[in-house]
Amino acid sequence: MSVSVHETRKSRSSTGSMNVTLFHKASHPDCVLAHLNTLRKHCMFTDVTLWAGDRAFPCHRAVLAASSRYFEAMFSHGLRESRDDTVNFQDNLHPEVLELLLDFAYSSRIAINEENAESLLEAGDMLQFHDVRDAAAEFLEKNLFPSNCLGMMLLSDAHQCRRLYEFSWRMCLVHFETVRQSEDFNSLSKDTLLDLISSDELETEDERVVFEAILQWVKHDLEPRKVHLPELLRSVRLALLPSDCLQEAVSSEALLMADERTKLIMDEALRCKTRILQNDGVVTSPCARPRKAGHTLLILGGQTFMCDKIYQVDHKAKEIIPKADLPSPRKEFSASAIGCKVYVTGGRGSENGVSKDVWVYDTVHEEWSKAAPMLIARFGHGSAELENCLYVVGGHTSLAGVFPASPSVSLKQVEKYDPGANKWMMVAPLRDGVSNAAVVSAKLKLFVFGGTSIHRDMVSKVQCYDPSENRWTIKAECPQPWRYTAAAVLGSQIFIMGGDTEFTAASAYRFDCETNQWTRIGDMTAKRMSCHALASGNKLYVVGGYFGTQRCKTLDCYDPTSDTWNCITTVPYSLIPTAFVSTWKHLPA
């Protein structure tokens, strides 16, 4: 039943007032479109014929141009097709797919299924039926499997379907062992293969899977591909291969010894392996860097806000296990990991004094040591590892000559620590001093989100530090002013969650540090202020925090592929998390 609306209005003119009725029939557009479709099927008033294969489709130029920018440009910019009464796609377009697109143009409806989804995505992109392309991509997202995710990744990359690409990419990383057995794997470009195997988020319990995958790819088309082997080998964590596997590869794999560059790479891997087996200090070579799925998750916390213990998260048993005591209990410090070591910087001790101290926990030998103190005593600061160095950012220090100790305004000063030299140095200061900000490293840069300003206001800026230029820039504005948030990194995506207001406490966002664009993701399961987050494999983990008088007692996990949060385990009631870090696991023999 059609619905119409009559509105009576008064309009004043030179002759006085008069009544005007505005009539609106909501179903009119559908009726017109339906009748145009009837006219098309009877070839009435059609003025162009589209050909695909051996089939002809009479159409109306106006309907095509209104439905697709492709046809609008074709018919209005003086192209040959704007004058001809036929457009021939020949064999570039399947007739059944073109028929579906035309039915959509004349009805606004289309049936997408497993058999036509890929073809509709390709044709929708080619003919700029972007709504159809996006609908097909959404259908394919819901039908992603390890067996088809590589093909979907390549398809979505070719047709600018970013969301489908991200989901497919994540699934390729999670199921790499299955992906390498697919037909598409051996046809990958070198650059795409390199992107996959160089990712810290690639999930495999055995680096031999990656090593064997690149040899498989090179041997599939040996002559043109063997030149790429050195570059590919540099992205394999060769020092994480078992010793016997590494030795056997060097002695029996002729392909590895055929090029001087590959020989040097394998020699370096053997040297790193020897150092690892001899416990000869921290091995920071890229060939010895574990992927994130091979990291150990550690929580620093205590029974009060004064942290006095390290706990280890056992993924499989879903338990949180006490690991070691802190030599000097403290609060409002920051903690970051470099390799197998945890660096605890600054904070306030039991006497409320602000500390310059840096305590280092070696997870291999399970012992504490002191590193060189920071140049400025600080608390409420952030820290992050970048290129095997530690950066501490912002925070507060104590005001000189004030007793008892009183906090300063938010600091601009940023310090860099070199573990090899055991030395601190100042680098370029923040554009805006902040405390209680979220600090992470991604894509060889530091990012600082929000925080408390020198005027004690919440900050909404994203500050970015480029170490190659020793310079800070403002990259973007946050969706809202933030402080007491947590941040974690997956590839080029930085995830921000929590905060100290009713509107931010449960919210979570994704920031693309290559495009500087924000995306809202699913809310957390609870409101969290001062929570802590990190990435492991292709998932995010968040722990701790509170809101009002309610403490958050769960360790939750976020899966980006499904945009869902789930509880992993309950944090012991006596534990109040103060920091959350991931370190390298003990490296295999």
Curated annotation (Swiss-Prot):
One of its GO terms (molecular function) is ubiquitin-like ligase-substrate adaptor activity. PROSITE patterns: BTB. Pfam families: BACK, Beta-prop_ATRN-LZTR1, BTB. The keyword Repeat applies. Kelch repeats lie at residues 296-340, 341-388, 389-444, 446-492, 494-538, 539-585. GO terms for biological process: negative regulation of fatty acid biosynthetic process; positive regulation of CD4-positive, CD25-positive, alpha-beta regulatory T cell differentiation; positive regulation of fatty acid oxidation; protein ubiquitination; regulation of translational initiation; ubiquitin-dependent protein catabolic process. Signal peptide: none annotated. Substrate-specific adapter of a BCR (BTB-CUL3-RBX1) E3 ubiquitin ligase complex involved in various processes, such as translation homeostasis and lipid synthesis. The BCR(KLHL25) ubiquitin ligase complex acts by mediating ubiquitination of hypophosphorylated EIF4EBP1 (4E-BP1): ubiquitination and subsequent degradation of hypophosphorylated EIF4EBP1 (4E-BP1) probably serves as a homeostatic mechanism to maintain translation and prevent eIF4E inhibition when eIF4E levels are low. The BCR(KLHL25) complex does not target EIF4EBP1 (4E-BP1) when it is hyperphosphorylated or associated with eIF4E. This is Kelch-like protein 25. The lineage of its organism: Eukaryota, Metazoa, Chordata, Craniata, Vertebrata.
